[in-house]
């Protein structure tokens, strides 16, 4: 497998992500878990192309120092997440059941 075809690894250690995930209703939290499990079976090229994830760059938020860009992606019908790529890791910063909340418009 070429380096660009390696499976995505997840970093779910952000306290904001953990807090927001734990605050979801049980059904939403389970759908998020299933989506994250799916992402582990994808390459980065798969993530970029996956119609269900709707991976898109966030233009309205300045990324933290050292991060090229922040992205939002769908984890369920009602939940989106914010994160960024760091090497082969997807560092997930938060999950929001309110789509506008994922874009910082709350």
Protein language model annotation of sequence segments:
Residues 1-79, 85-106:
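Basic, Lys/Arg-enriched alpha-helical interface segments
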């Amino acid at each position: 497998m070429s380096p660009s075809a390696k499976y995505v690894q997840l970093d779910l250690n952000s306290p904001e992500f953990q807090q927001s995930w734990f605050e979801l209703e049980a059904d939403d939290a389970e759908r998020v878990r299933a989506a994250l499990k799916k992402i582990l079976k994808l390459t980065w090229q798969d993530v970029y192309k996956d119609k269900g994830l709707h991976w898109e760059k966030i233009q309205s938020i300045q990324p933290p120092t050292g991060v090229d860009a922040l992205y939002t992606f769908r984890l369920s019908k009602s939940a989106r997440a914010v994160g960024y790529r760091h090497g082969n890791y997807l560092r997930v910063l938060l999950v929001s059941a309110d789509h506008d909340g994922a874009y910082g418009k709350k």
